Amino acid sequence: MSSSANSLNALSFDNSYARLPTHFYQKVAQTPLEDAHLISFNGDVAEALGLNRSQLDPEELARYCGGGGALETGESIAMKYAGHQFGHYNPDLGDGRGLLLGEVVTADNRRLDLHLKGAGRTAYSRFGDGRAVLRSSIREYLVSAAMNSLGVSSTSALCLVGSEEYTMRNGMEPCAMVLRVTPCHIRFGHFEHFYYLGQHDDLKLLADYCIERYFPQLQEADNPYLAMFNEVRNRTADLVAQWQSYGFVHGVMNTDNMSIIGETFDYGPFTFLDSYDPNFISNKNDTAGRYAFKQQPGIALWNLSALAQALLPLIPLDDLKRSLDDFADLYSAAFYGKMSQRLGLTQQGADGSLRQLIDDLLTLFAANNTDMNRFMRALSRYDGNESSLSFMSDLSCDSRGFSEWKARFCKHVDSSDVTLADRTQAMLQVNPEYILRNYMLEEAIREAHQGDYLPVQNLLKIVKNPFNAQPGAERYAEAPPDWAGAICLTCSS
């Protein structure tokens, strides 16, 4: 394969998952969208695939991704899996509107899946129509770019394709497709499917496939299956620590939405907190608050326990219990490590006093409805002078508690060997100027429904460069408008 191609069909394709037994999936062709057109594509993702961003033909991208032309990827497939949804096992899951088109084999021999969301009905669609709407597609397309740019592990999206086709969701809505790119589409629920059917040979075959493709370094371990589970646990702990440190609420942490490689996967009613609220629920359908912001670490452990249950035919129970027992410490180390970075205090290590400083700050955030990300960005500019902390009053952080916290923070800074300039530089690289808030997405979606896609393209530029101030984007660094709090999100997509 050449180092830079100008067409998707010029890439080198494979589909290793399709070489597994046919009951692992269903072969199905995508259903073309009516009058498909390209809304936006992510040049960085294109280059990761080996495409030349400057030579890509928008009409060709729309044709291939909208179903008007066949990609030479082999036969596209819908994967079968199961999962626990809101704590209840559901055996009747699978790719109900998405198709795994195949794997791009890059010049450096990496494998990246291409998965088309909104591609039409499959055997696993149940009562769904197999489509995705423009609203949810814009959200996934933009947030995947935002998360990757923040350094939070996430799937990517090559392009967003719109259409003149409509379907019923919140009223009649236009259909769209997103071409998702990630090394892995294996969910916790893939393993649950075979376990609960008692198909232990297939369970072993799936685990062997995952170790060979995603964790080849574990093949020589004493128990490769336990080593794989430990790696999934480690990555999951790190991922959720990243979420909590940036105030990200996934919204639907079902086991079928959990990736075994620790990526944020299957975006739905997600939210970045405008004000810090541990009890915040981003999904209106989550009436019990199972997936509230503060619950996410515990739910991650619950989901890992469900995966452990599914792996019992391969791993001794006591080994799995010991592995799960280590999750809390792994998560805490990752979370406090990330928060220490955000405070510019990494050189001290997350010792007891620093952890207490972080805990107390989060308590103050919750008590004062503080905008966590705006606070941390402003704190990055602390230059040793009291005046550089005046932003606390502007952010309603002028309580006695904040004054006491400020004094303790300054003491930590003063005891460090790191210069203020170096600390500021480091903090500005982990505390974003811009975070992708729901109101920003809502504005772009409203315009897109009127046929104006420029706001989507502008937001993509902003969220791909979140740590640097950008001309014309000043308002996105300010407090969200009052109406932002009334935005209602559900699982509808």
From Swiss-Prot:
Catalytic activity field: L-seryl-[protein] + ATP = 3-O-(5'-adenylyl)-L-seryl-[protein] + diphosphate; L-threonyl-[protein] + ATP = 3-O-(5'-adenylyl)-L-threonyl-[protein] + diphosphate; L-tyrosyl-[protein] + ATP = O-(5'-adenylyl)-L-tyrosyl-[protein] + diphosphate; L-histidyl-[protein] + UTP = N(tele)-(5'-uridylyl)-L-histidyl-[protein] + diphosphate
Cofactor dependency: Mg(2+); Mn(2+)
Keywords assigned: ATP-binding, Magnesium, Manganese, Metal-binding, Nucleotide-binding, Nucleotidyltransferase, Transferase
Pfam families xref list: SelO
Binding site for Mg(2+): 257, 266
Active site per UniProt: 256
GO molecular function: AMPylase activity; ATP binding; magnesium ion binding
Enzyme Commission (EC) number: 2.7.7.-, 2.7.7.108
InterPro entries: SelO
Residues annotated as binding ATP: 94, 96-97, 117, 129-130, 180, 187, 266
Classification via NCBIfam families: PRK00029.1
Protein family per UniProt: Belongs to the SELO family.
Chain's role: Nucleotidyltransferase involved in the post-translational modification of proteins. It can catalyze the addition of adenosine monophosphate (AMP) or uridine monophosphate (UMP) to a protein, resulting in modifications known as AMPylation and UMPylation.
Identification of the protein by name: Protein nucleotidyltransferase YdiU
Species: Hahella chejuensis (strain KCTC 2396)
